[in-house]
């Protein structure tokens, strides 16, 4: 009673004793009739009156809270047999815990329902008593009890959770209510949904009690995504159980599997009929899918095996097909559903090479209208009127190209320019257009009417294709686009065309400066492409600097006061890339020329300040980004369209920010990290270039070489003049660097903040000291080089003299040898003449005798061969005689046979002669 007395004292302090005395006395009389009445009907009438007055009056709720709870709790404990009294007591409790409608309550009144909830939940026995009532057979008793527990949960969540955990079979009783009548089931479902939020112990018990089976059973019974708000509550409860709980996800995957979740996404019946509740149900199911895909937020990237297993199993169960049907092929799906679908597709393939390959192989459409899924998503990006859908679909390509060199190369290989259409063709007219052709068509669209929205979106996709892939960057640099009107212009490289579009967007922005339609993002996205393209690509820098107008335009953009902080910062980064990735030695296009142009246009301090302004902007500063916590959808039969589409851009924006909030999604952590790393490299490189101005080309070897026909005296004089010229140039550079340092110092004094002042001073000191030190080193090196060259030339002159003497000696030796040869030749000619004149005739052999000897030898050999032939003929003749005798014995006419043989021989001889 001490607690009740103190509570009553608070009421008196708030409302005054006189104002609340009437309510207090009336409530007290009713409580006396209920607790001390002898007639049952009188007691029942009193509790009905108490119930009515408590439900309608805030003052009555306050008065009831002071003394009514002990009476009502006593009824629930001791009068269970009197069903009407128990019902009345529960309804009275519910009325005391339910806030009065704000339209009827005064704004100055204290929330009595909140105070009553606090008073009732302080005693854990009261919660245990209410949980025991769930086992009663009466429908209304169980129904009102669940409503009371829900009201307590809304106002005293922590106490109720602790009391339920300490009550034996507390969670079990609530889970049993899911199998009760529909009305009770729905109330129990709503109670469990609120109870399991951020309560890990309760989540484990609920899962152990078979929550997954019961949830999917209710969803199936209600008709899946076509069901009412009960399906939303089931999915909300499911999400509470799976969120940040790898063990529950593994249990679901290994027991029931993911098929029940995936089946919710299957469109049934009339596909274009999307009610608001169906939209909310689909969004809740997609949120479940997203939680399974993303895993725990505190897990290191690449080490969440549960996340990878979930992604693999989901794709094996054809989830990708359902997502593509819902997000791409279903033209009537709400924008919010399509956006969430694209996010799930992107998360599904993020860091999963196999899933990326499966997506790349998917085709959509029917019959002759079939095209790759990636082409269909690109078509949506270029055509959709929703910025949210563009951002979501762009995320698919971001995750597809991230660390996927083969995928990027595959997409870049299709970048083949098509002939410029004679009429304004729409992208949807040709489904057989390749990915690259469609992307190039999107990049070039809008040039005639100045609408660069499509070009901007295509530029975002191209930035993913060329990111961290030098091969794709070089491939894109070789693309040359035709002019829309050949008679009005010449073909130009794709890179320069995009720079020209950036200039067009800048001029359009300046013309529409007074317009209040939305925020800027076209220039930022094009600049993002150029920054990404130029990283580690000297060829792209050279292509950019091939036109002097590009550097001039970029300098104007950096100093343009009408441009946003983000635009000026990104333009400064692109300008810095033209320094750190510049490999040119051509005057006017080298790194020194770019740095010199920056110094003359704005000065180093002003240039570096653009980096600091950008890093402190809304887009690049993590501290200024809105927290992305979990926000459940409102449980109403008809959620508002604004809530479904999540159009909360005004809440996300900071006052004074000129950049579009959608850039928060497009400028992801990897790009912001790239910009920050480039900023540091640019600072170091610019200081280095200023410290060593044109050091690579200052000493020209050709000027140090002795010209032909130049004597040593003239050569030495020319070397002295060259050294004097170099010294003069060094002095000029030192004076110029001193002026720059003074400019940095004076600019640093005008900085408002002490931090900026220190940074400017640091840069100034570093530039000045480093430049002087480097210049002195360069001067000393150049003087040493000239001295070394002079010594080398003198050495070469001495060497040449020695060589000339040697050559003269060799020439004399050759002359002597030539004279010797002439003498030998003369002697030989004299010998020939003497031979021709008959002197000392030579003795020749007797040829006729030799011929006679040879003839005799040949005749002798012929006679020997003839004798051998005669011997052979004799032998053959004896064989013929023997054969003839044998034939005669056999009765053959030998003479006739020999004649025939002779005739045949003659005929054969004649034929050979012919």
UniProtKB/Swiss-Prot annotation:
Residues 723-837, 863-901 form a coiled coil. The modification Phosphoserine is found at residue 911. One of its GO terms (cellular component) is Golgi membrane. This is Golgin candidate 6. The C-terminal domain (689-914) is necessary and sufficient for Golgi targeting. Disruption phenotype: Dwarf plants and accumulation of the precursors of the two major storage proteins albumin 2S and globulin 12S in dry seeds. It is found in: Golgi apparatus; Golgi apparatus, Golgi stack. The lineage of its organism: Eukaryota, Viridiplantae, Streptophyta, Embryophyta, Tracheophyta. It comes from Arabidopsis thaliana. Its main location: Golgi.
